[in-house]
Amino acid sequence: MGICLIIVGLALLALEPYKIKAPKNIDKLKENAETLKHFDGGFNPDNFFNTYKTKIAFKESDSLVKIYQLNKDEHIEEYTIPFSNVIESEIALDNQIISKVSKSGIVAGGLLAGGIGAAIGGLSASSIQNEMVKSVTLKITVEDLGKPIHYIDFLPTQEVEGYNIQGYKKDSNVIQQALTNAEYWHGVMDVIIKKANKVAQ
């Protein structure tokens, strides 16, 4: 069931915004998404999520998170992160943080008050004047001086042909799917951080 939901979410998230703006781009997006989806199949994760340029997966029995990124040369960069190395997770809408959890015990935002979907309704009028959202991003901070920050974008980004510069209506299916995916993975990071803290005690 989880895999089916991921595939449905992927179709909505990675392809739907391009159907009108850049139909010629759909085949390339599908190809990139399929490449990332099947990459490192031997890891056998408990769950994963991928778009056309990033993939995140975790395996509880190995206490590992893996993040994969398709770079500009179309090579996949792979990062293996032990649960104990996850320091912080936060969700931002249009660069405004709406929820954050960390090893230090900081907890803020939607997970405490009705979920991320409810949090979007509380954003100030100045931040979303015309009811549009341009980005939904998960930021993960880890103990790795070489690559301390990882971003998972749940909406298309500006470097991709067909990017909707006006954003998407906050009550649209595209935004609701992005929020659902972001909240789930933020919740996964929250559980991972709590598990690591218990082990460290």
From Swiss-Prot:
Task: Specify the domain of life of the species encoding this protein.
Answer: Viruses
Under which name does UniProt file this protein? Immunity protein
Q: Which gene encodes it?
A: D
